[in-house]
């Protein structure tokens, strides 16, 4: 629980004592189940199976799942019900084995359940007496004699009971009923089934009758005691009630419940056949009566025994009396009514008992060290319980542990082969060490014993975590204050040595490390450099290892030289093994006969390992004296014996169930709990098919618990329990068992994948919440139906089974179990899901579930960070990335690293921090959408601020790979279809394949010392072709890096011999190469690696290009000639010549879609040829560029072939191939030259590099705007290479460093609009979602609230100073420093009219949008009509900080010492308040909900409430002395009750204006701005970080929302730019922040006290951006300009309208209602329409 839930409740003394015992290693003081809160709630159901079937089925279907959910959510524990009768066949109810198992499990539940443990369901049926499974020989013979005496036939007993001399003493046992076929009451053949059952029914009834009569006779004769007779005369239910309730304390009985159902006058209905299952009957039809003897026993149990218990304790007992239907008896309807009531009462009782008895245990949740210690302690107790050998080794270890007076001490080493008992020996030592030391050093001593079974927990695999956990345990035990544990491994080792020296005579120390070979190689742990060879006097270290693993024993011998410090565990001799076996058998009252002993001795002569002895014991304990035993009865190796054990289990429980159960336990990362095993097997259709072989399945489809119990019993001691984080897991006791289970059950890949999928689905919660999983029954059940008379019924059955789906009752799997929805930080972590899900998803190939179920799941991220597992988060993301190669994961990991410190300190801020960083890039990284939506859904639980639009500049650095000391050594770079793999060629002849992310060299080829001229990959990346200075082409198999062939390129016979390969290219199946100054092109077959023929051209070849289909080759030559050849035949088709034939063909481009060829010559001229008729190409376009003095650097055809990018030294041109004209042209700045340019994959961006510039530039192709300029820290970029597979770019710098840039991320980074200047003011309309910003320039920018992009720019003549909007936002009035005012139509961008004449100090607009108030400092202020521009009145008084009252009657402002209310109709001062002499007004505000009350603060440090109506001070509040010295701002709540005052410090001052009390709330930093929400519930403020706070992230300030009701900060969000303006919207609590770079951030507040949780986040348009995949970049903004001509000129008291003004010219003295002229009526209409729209769209708001 976090952050301090556990701290709110002091731990009880028992817990503290348990904790102390665990930390000091006093294992005998720990309870058997170890987990402080109990391992689970386990409830045993005691009932007669016949009459409670419906109740138990209903409880299982509806009540148990709810109780399980309750326990998981509130206590982090499992709720398990043990009902062994459920799901098994009727003929097994009487089984002695089942009854024995029931009593054993009942005892377990009573001992180990953390809460309720026993529920009795008792009806009118007493139940059958039991058939004994085994009877001592003397007792059995006495019963036989008594039966003969009673004249009973005893042949049946003699036939069914067999004498067994292997029992001690000898006994008779009931033979197995193998001859009785398995059947079930639900079978589709009831009559046949009954016939099958009859013989056994009769036999069992007769056996019971004989036992009953004989035992009664013996009891009457005094030959048998009552306690003995009970075995034969009592029913199972009485035994269970007596055992559970008979001798218990009142405190214990609080955990038990009994439900008694009485049926009134049941005897009357005895003849109704269906009533036989509700009571005991005797006799045959028609003389059927209720069994009086059974009724007597029932009354004794129900009406005497239970009431006696109730009288002495608080046992809960509920009795209900049911009345039968007169005709039908105990009908279905009556039973259903009873069951409904029982279900409700059962649920309430269980909840009551759980809440009263189970403690919420958060210790292991918050304390990983405590959990680690408990895990090893529980393993230690388990292993010690299996220790059998009392050997000399134990005495040596005992002697070693005791303190010695002299001599130096070394660690002691125990070694031996597998299965020699090293772990059990060390566990026994660890268990006894505390007691030995305590006994030796006296009662006042307090020894410390630390035990670790290496490799069994996450913290005991690596040396670093092992040393850390041991050091932490030492520090706690020896009360050493360690400020922080070292990060470096050598420092950690030094700390470990120092802590060893803390031991003393009173506090000796023993450290036991089992299985050193299990340590990982990390930090060179296996070299044992960390192990101290010499120990302090009171320290003992005991180690164990295998002798031949990793050379550990050899290294130990180099470290510790004394032979006395080594104990070798060698196999025992045969005699000792026989002795041990004999003792083990006697403990369970068994032995072997002398004849059988021969075969035992024979087995022990082959193997005497302790584990073999134990496995042999498992086998021989089941031998019977009359059964034949031979050499094959016992295996002779451990391996074979384990296999034999598993096979015997398969016979008992079913092959599929055992193989899958053991398979799941083996493949689970940490093991499985018992309930998880049940759940997972229920989801496995192959297991359920086996279990439902002869029955029709029904809901819920589960594995009967009996099979799980048999499995556990059969593997007792081998499948052990281990406690991890409040959960008890089943794990293998040793690695040998695990290896054999793996070999037998986890070999087939298809099975493995299916099982991993089932486990992954389980931990994902795919089938939870009642979701039904399809189940198709296999043939055996249907085959059993073949003798049905009606064939159509069989078809119906088949159809039913094909369509059937069943609830498997899998539990929900949230990441955390929430105790209280209103306290989201109090929770139990679902550690099982945390540890298992990722493991199974990566092994079953469910990539989407891996991404969206874990990594992109906000709840997982938040929980992991909250519990301190930040580094594990990064490791898991890296694992998922390696598995899926999704670049979103890489970006998420770098994002998390950048906010590490912030979210570790304040995990609640995670959602806001992620949203700020992910929103700008989500259009380019679409898989992050899921995480953003998760943040929207779950983030507001922890942080109420939700960013709607983020303007954060995302930092990005490419992957870098140093290739050589200089770019001159790098010959070629090739990207591949794998985004992280590149091929590089160096001039020294080496070709390397690199993984750029890991900087790992994957493969390398050396080209035999020849210099590489170039290399190319075939389109399918099958072949790598390399050109060398030896004039050879080397063709390699790219996958295996092996040379396939080497082809020499030859020129013409008359050519000079010293020429090199000038160039080469690849087509689909061919390579084409040509030499310098050669007219021939050699064509090579790639598949066979030999030259086919040579193309002979007219002139020297300069470039070659092939068509996409690989049919034609185009050879460019000198004098601008191009010859076309057929690649298949070598035929020359034609030659074309450009008109500008002075130079040579430098580039050729083939446009397959348009059937065109483009020739670009050395001077940049370009010609386009139509190749539809390949034999006669036609010239269609010609561009003469010879006048330009700029050479062509590179050329590229866009992927869709719609544009050609031509990069020249001084310019970049984009040629539209549709119209063949230059679409865009970008010129380099003065003294700058382009080195290279390419198009992004989608063609939206141009990427270029400049000469001598260490940066990559990104331009938007449509606007020419520079989106980003990214610095390359490794030096000037000399080469750009674009990937044809991914939107990636490779750049090579002068220093020989290769960088890989992700263009998607860079495009997204630049997807933020900025005005370029600091935002000075933000204006929001009362309605609508548009934002207007002023930034000290001549523009007003109109922002789209939803997208955060600039929609329009309104240009003015001067710098814009003021801006106001009508309430709908349709009209905008602005003023600039050139004394002009403008009225704009915001939708069309039209400047409707312009007024000149006076510089405005403040603009106001009335609430009804009819009038504008233009306040001036130097001249008269004016009120004018917005629709016409006509003056209403002049205001002669200068006003500051003015407001218009809500009734639109007054404009209220202040002067130095007065508050004035001026009439909007006359301009005269109607009301005023004057301060006393020398006192000035500092600030004032209107109260929104009280429009006639004004609040102002004076220099006398008083806050005054002044009534405008009465012109009196209503209330005056005196502030503390010097309070206003640094007044920054103050806000008034809408109801006028609170005033919020900020003084530029770290305090928020909340003033209660009614009581005058001042409350100070500490803020997170120095407050810069504050704003009160419109409803007065929240205060939004921005504060700057304290200087002493050390955070690695670049946050400058924080945006914080405080809920005024409780003063709690409900949200905080870092701001990474300097804020310049803060605004809140009126309608919703939306926050808009303007920044110094001209960008804006938009946030909203979602407080959970809001009923609807502001669903607007998910539905808001800002979220539609990333739901709309097509929108990847910001749209172009519209630009609107001001009117040059002035429509109206203001003079001192008059207006002069221009002749062409849209406003009617009229005298100011005329009526205010002016009529517009006909000429300009349209403009007037537009203004009026804009004003009218408010009444159509919204309700009027005065």
Swiss-Prot record:
Keyword Repeat attributed:
yes
Keyword annotations: Leucine-rich repeat, Repeat, WD repeat
Q: In which ranges do the WD repeats occur? A: 963-1004, 1007-1046, 1140-1179, 1229-1271, 1272-1311, 1314-1353, 1355-1394, 1396-1434, 1476-1516, 1522-1561, 1614-1653
- Where does the record place Polar residues bias? 1703-1715
Under Gene3D superfamilies, the record lists: P-loop containing nucleotide triphosphate hydrolases, YVTN repeat-like/Quinoprotein amine dehydrogenase
A single GO cellular-component term from the record reads:
synapse
All copies of the NACHT domain together span: 410-737
Region Disordered, residue ranges = 1702-1721
Cross-referenced PROSITE patterns, in alphabetical order? WD_REPEATS_1 (PS00678), WD_REPEATS_REGION (PS50294)
Which parts are the LRR repeats? 386-410, 677-698, 724-747, 883-906, 925-953
Q: Name the chain's protein.
A: NACHT and WD repeat domain-containing protein 2
Source organism of the structure? Mus musculus
């Amino acid at each position: 629980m976090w952050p301090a839930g556990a701290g709110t409740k002091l731990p009880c003394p028992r817990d503290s004592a348990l904790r102390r015992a665990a930390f000091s290693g006093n294992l005998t003081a720990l309870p058997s189940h170890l987990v402080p809160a109990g391992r689970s709630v386990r409830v045993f159901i005691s009932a007669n199976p016949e009459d409670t079937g419906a109740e138990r089925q209903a409880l299982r279907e509806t009540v148990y799942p709810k109780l399980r959910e309750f326990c998981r959510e509130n206590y982090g524990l499992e709720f398990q019900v043990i009902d062994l009768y459920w799901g098994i066949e009727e003929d097994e109810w009487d089984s002695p084995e089942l009854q024995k198992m029931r009593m054993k499990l009942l005892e377990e539940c009573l001992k180990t359940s953390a809460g309720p443990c026993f529920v009795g369901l008792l009806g009118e049926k007493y139940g059958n007496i039991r058939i004994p499974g085994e009877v001592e020989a003397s007792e059995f013979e006495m019963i036989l004699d008594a039966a003969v005496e009673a004249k009973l036939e005893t042949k049946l007993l003699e036939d069914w009971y067999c004498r067994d001399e292997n029992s001690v003493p000898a006994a008779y046992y009931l033979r197995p009923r193998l001859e009785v076929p398995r059947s079930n009451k639900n079978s589709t053949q009831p009559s046949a089934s009954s016939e099958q059952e009859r013989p056994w029914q009769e036999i069992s009834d007769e056996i019971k009758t004989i036992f009953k009569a004989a035992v009664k006779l013996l009891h009457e004769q005094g030959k048998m005691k009552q306690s003995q007779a009970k075995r034969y005369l009592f029913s199972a239910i009485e035994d269970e009630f007596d055992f559970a309730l008979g001798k218990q304390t009142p405190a214990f009985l609080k955990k038990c419940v009994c439900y008694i159902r009485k049926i009134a006058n049941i005897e009357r209905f005895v003849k109704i056949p269906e009533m036989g299952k509700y009571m005991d009957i005797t006799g045959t039809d028609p003389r059927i009566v209720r069994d009086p003897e059974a009724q007597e026993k029932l009354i004794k149990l129900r009406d005497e025994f239970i009431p006696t218990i109730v009288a002495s304790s608080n046992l809960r007992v509920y009795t209900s009396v049911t009345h039968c239907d007169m005709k039908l008896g105990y009908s279905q309807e009556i039973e259903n009514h009873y069951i409904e009531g029982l279900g409700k009462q059962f649920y309430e009782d269980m909840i009551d008992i759980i809440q009263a008895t189970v403690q919420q245990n958060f210790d292991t949740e918050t304390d990983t060290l405590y959990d680690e210690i408990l895990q090893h302690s529980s393993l230690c107790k388990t292993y010690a319980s299996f220790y059998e050998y009392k050997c000399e080794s134990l005495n040596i270890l005992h002697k070693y542990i005791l303190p010695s007076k002299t001599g130096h001490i070394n660690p002691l080493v125990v070694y031996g082969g597998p299965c020699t008992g090293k772990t059990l020996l060390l566990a026994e030592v660890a268990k006894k060490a505390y007691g030995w030391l305590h006994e030796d050093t006296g009662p006042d001593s307090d020894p410390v014993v630390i035990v670790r079974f290496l490799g069994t927990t996450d913290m005991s695999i690596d040396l670093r975590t092992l040393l850390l956990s041991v050091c932490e345990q030492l520090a706690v035990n020896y009360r050493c204050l360690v400020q922080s544990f070292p990060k470096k491994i050598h420092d950690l080792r030094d700390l470990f040595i120092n802590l060893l020296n803390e031991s003393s005579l009173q506090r000796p120390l023993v450290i036991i490390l089992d299985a050193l070979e299990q340590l990982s190689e990390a930090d060179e742990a296996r070299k044992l450099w960390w192990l101290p060879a010499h120990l302090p006097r009171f320290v003992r270290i005991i180690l164990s290892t295998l002798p031949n693993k990793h050379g550990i024993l050899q290294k130990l011998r180099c470290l510790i030289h004394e032979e006395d410090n080594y104990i070798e565990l060698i196999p025992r001799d045969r005699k000792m093994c026989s002795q041990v076996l004999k003792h083990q058998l006697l403990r369970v009252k068994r032995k072997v006969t002398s004849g059988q002993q021969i075969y035992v001795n024979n087995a022990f002569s082959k193997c005497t390992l302790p584990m073999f002895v134990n496995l042999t014991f498992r086998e021989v304990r089941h031998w019977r004296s009359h059964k034949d035993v031979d050499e094959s009865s016992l295996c002779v190796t451990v391996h074979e014996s384990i296999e034999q054990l598993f096979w015997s289990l398969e016979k008992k429980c079913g092959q599929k169930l055992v193989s899958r159960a053991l398979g799941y336990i083996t493949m689970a990362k940490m093991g499985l709990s018992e309930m998880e095993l049940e759940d997972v097997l229920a989801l496995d259709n192959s297991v359920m098919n086996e279990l439902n072989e002869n029955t029709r399945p029904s809901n819920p489809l589960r594995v009967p618990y009996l099979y799980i119990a048999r499995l556990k019993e059969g593997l007792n001691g081998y499948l052990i329990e281990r406690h991890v984080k409040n959960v008890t897991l089943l794990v293998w006791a040793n690695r040998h068992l695990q290896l054999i289970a793996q070999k037998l059950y986890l070999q087939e890949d298809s099975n493995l994948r299916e099982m991993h999928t089932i486990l992954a689905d389980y931990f994902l919660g795919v089938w939870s919440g009642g979701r039904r999983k399809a189940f198709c029954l296999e043939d055996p059940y249907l085959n059993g139906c073949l003798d049905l008379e009606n064939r159509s019924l069989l078809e119906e059955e088949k159809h039913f089974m094909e369509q059937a789906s069943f609830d498997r009752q899998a539990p929900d799997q949230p990441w955390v179990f929430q105790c209280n929805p209103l306290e989201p930080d109090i929770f139990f972590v679902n550690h099982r899901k945390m540890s298992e899900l990722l493991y199974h998803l990566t092994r079953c190939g469910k990539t989407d579930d891996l991404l969206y179920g874990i990594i992109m799941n906000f709840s997982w991220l938040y929980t992991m960070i909250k519990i301190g597992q930040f580094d594990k988060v990064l490791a898991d993301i890296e694992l998922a990335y390696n598995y899926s190669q999704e670049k979103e994961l890489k970006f998420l990991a770098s994002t998390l690293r950048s906010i590490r410190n912030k979210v570790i300190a304040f995990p609640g801020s995670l959602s806001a921090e992620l949203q700020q960083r992910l929103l700008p890039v989500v259009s380019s990284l679409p898989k992050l959408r899921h995480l953003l939506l998760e943040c929207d859904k779950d983030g507001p639980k922890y942080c109420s601020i939700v960013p709607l639009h983020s303007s954060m500049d995302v930092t990005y650095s490419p992957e870098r790979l140093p290739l050589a000391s200089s770019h001159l050594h790098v010959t070629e770079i090739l990207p591949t279809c794998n985004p992280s793999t590149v091929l590089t060629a160096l001039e020294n002849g080496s070709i390397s394949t690199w993984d750029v992310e890991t900087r790992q060299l994957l493969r390398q080829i050396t080209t035999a010392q020849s210099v590489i001229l170039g290399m190319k990959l075939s389109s399918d990346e099958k072949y790598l072709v390399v050109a060398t200075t030896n004039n050879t082409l080397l063709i390699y198999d790219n996958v295996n890096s092996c040379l396939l062939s080497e082809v020499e390129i030859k020129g013409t016979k008359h050519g000079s011999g010293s020429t090199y390969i000038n160039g080469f290219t690849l087509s689909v199946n061919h390579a084409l190469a040509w030499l310098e100054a050669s007219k021939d092109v050699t064509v090579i077959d790639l598949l066979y690696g030999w030259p086919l023929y040579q193309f002979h051209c007219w002139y020297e070849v300069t470039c070659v290009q092939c068509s996409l289909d690989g049919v034609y080759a185009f050879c460019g030559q000198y004098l601008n000639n191009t010859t076309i050849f057929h690649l298949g035949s070598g035929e020359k088709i034609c030659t074309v010549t450009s008109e500008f034939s002075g130079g040579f063909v430098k580039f050729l481009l083939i446009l397959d879609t348009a059937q065109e060829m483009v020739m670009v010559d050395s001077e940049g001229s370009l010609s386009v040829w139509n190749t539809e008729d390949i034999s006669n190409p036609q010239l269609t376009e010609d561009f003469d560029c010879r006048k330009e003095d700029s050479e062509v650097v590179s050329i590229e055809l866009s992927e869709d072939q719609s544009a050609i990018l031509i990069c020249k030294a001084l310019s970049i041109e984009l040629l539209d191939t549709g119209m063949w004209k230059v679409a865009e042209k970008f010129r380099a700045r003065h003294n700058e030259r382009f080195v290279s340019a390419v198009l992004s994959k989608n063609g939206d961006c141009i990427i270029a590099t400049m000469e001598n510039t260490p940066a990559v530039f990104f331009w938007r192709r449509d606007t020419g705007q520079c989106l980003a300029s990214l610095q390359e820290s490794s030096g000037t970029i000399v080469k750009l290479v674009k990937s044809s597979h991914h939107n990636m770019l490779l750049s090579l710098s002068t220093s020989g460093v290769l960088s890989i840039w992700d263009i998607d991320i860079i495009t997204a980074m630049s997807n933020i609009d900025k005005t370029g200047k600091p935002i000075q003011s933000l204006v929001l309309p009362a309605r609508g979602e548009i934002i207007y910003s002023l930034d000290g320039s001549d523009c007003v920018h109109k922002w789209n609230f939803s997208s955060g992009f600039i929609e329009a720019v309104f240009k003015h003549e001067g710098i814009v100073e003021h801006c106001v909007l009508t309430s709908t936002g349709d009209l905008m009035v602005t003023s600039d420093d050139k004394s002009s005012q403008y009225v704009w139509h915001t939708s069309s961008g039209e400047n409707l009219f312009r007024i000149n004449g006076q510089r405005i100090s403040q603009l106001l607009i009335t609430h009804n949008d009819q009038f504008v108030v233009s306040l001036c400092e130097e001249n008269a202020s004016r009120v004018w009509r917005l629709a016409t521009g006509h003056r209403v009145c002049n205001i002669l008084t200068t006003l500051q900080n003015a407001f218009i009252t809500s009734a639109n009657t007054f404009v209220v402002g202040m002067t130095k010492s007065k508050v004035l209310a001026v009439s909007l109709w006359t301009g005269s001062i109607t009301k005023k308040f004057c301060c006393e002499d020398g006192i000035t007004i500092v600030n004032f505000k209107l109260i929104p909900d009280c429009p006639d009350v004004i609040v102002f603060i004076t220099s006398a440090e008083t806050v005054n409430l002044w009534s405008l109506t009465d012109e009196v001070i209503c209330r005056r509040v005196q502030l503390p002395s010097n309070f206003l010295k640094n007044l920054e701002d103050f806000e008034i709540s809408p109801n006028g009750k609170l005033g919020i005052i900020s003084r530029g410090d770290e305090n928020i001052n909340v003033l209660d204006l009614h009581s005058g009390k001042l409350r100070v709330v500490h803020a997170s930093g120095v407050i810069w701005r504050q704003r009160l929400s419109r409803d007065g519930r929240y205060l939004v403020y921005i504060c700057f970080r304290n200087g002493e706070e050390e955070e690695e992230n670049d946050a400058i300030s924080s945006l914080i929302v405080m809920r005024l009701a409780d003063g709690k900060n409900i949200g905080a969000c870092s701001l990474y730019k300097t804020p310049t303006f803060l605004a809140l919207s009126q309608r919703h609590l939306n926050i808009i922040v303007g920044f110094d770079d001209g960008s804006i951030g938009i946030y909203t507040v979602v407080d959970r006290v809001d009923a609807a949780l502001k669903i607007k986040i998910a539905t808001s348009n800002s979220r539609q951006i990333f739901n709309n995949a097509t929108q990847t970049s910001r749209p172009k903004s519209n630009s609107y300009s001001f009117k040059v001509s002035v429509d109206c000129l203001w003079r001192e008291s008059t207006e002069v309208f221009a002749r062409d003004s849209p406003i009617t010219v009229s005298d100011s003295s005329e009526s205010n209602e002016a009529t517009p002229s006909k000429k300009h009526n349209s403009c007037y209409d537009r203004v009026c329409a804009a004003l009218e729209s408010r009444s159509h769209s919204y309700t009027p708001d005065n």
